Regions:
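Amphipathic alpha-helical hairpins
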Residues: 1-161
């Protein structure tokens, strides 16, 4: 897709984050199946619900722009999901797998926060306040998830010894 102006850039970024959210949703479902720590499972399940809402918010953004929701492959998301899957598979025990999961969650959340910050700024500069609000909602959910993950990581790593 040629990027001739800011609108094109925003459209591409939206398509990429839309794809990323779908990829991460599938990854979260896999993490939920493999996690053993109950608090970790609970936070993953909450984030699955949040991610489903974020996808709906992105669909509203596309609608407000008069576009059909469309996914453009997000290679960063592919890499993060692939790395998480590999680390979960190679973990020698459940506690190590839980550590691999929380580490992956933290990486993903920081990628998403950066993506949404750029999108919010773009929407604000284009005068698209309703769109900026929807994207800000997603960004705030990502920030909350990152905070929860970062707070729970030390306990998981301590359990893994």
């Amino acid at each position: 897709m040629a990027i001739a102006n800011v609108n094109d850039l925003m459209a591409q970024a939206l398509q990429e984050i839309y794809d990323a959210e779908h990829q991460f949703l599938e990854g979260q479902r896999e993490m939920d199946q493999q996690a053993t720590d109950e608090d970790l499972k609970s936070s993953i399940q909450q984030h699955i619900s949040d991610t489903e809402q974020q996808i709906r918010n992105l669909e509203q953004v596309f609608e407000q722009l008069g576009q059909q929701p469309q996914r453009q492959t997000n290679e960063v998301a592919q890499g993060l999901v692939s790395e998480a899957q590999q680390n979960m598979q190679e973990a020698e025990n459940e506690a190590i797998r839980d550590c691999a999961i929380i580490a992956a969650v933290i990486k993903v959340e920081h990628f998403e926060m950066g993506s949404y910050r750029g999108l919010v700024t773009g929407a604000q500069q284009m005068g698209q306040n309703e769109i900026a609000n929807l994207l800000s909602e997603n960004m705030q959910q990502e920030e909350q998830t990152a905070q929860i993950a970062e707070q729970s990581a030390p306990d998981l790593f301590q359990k893994a010894g």
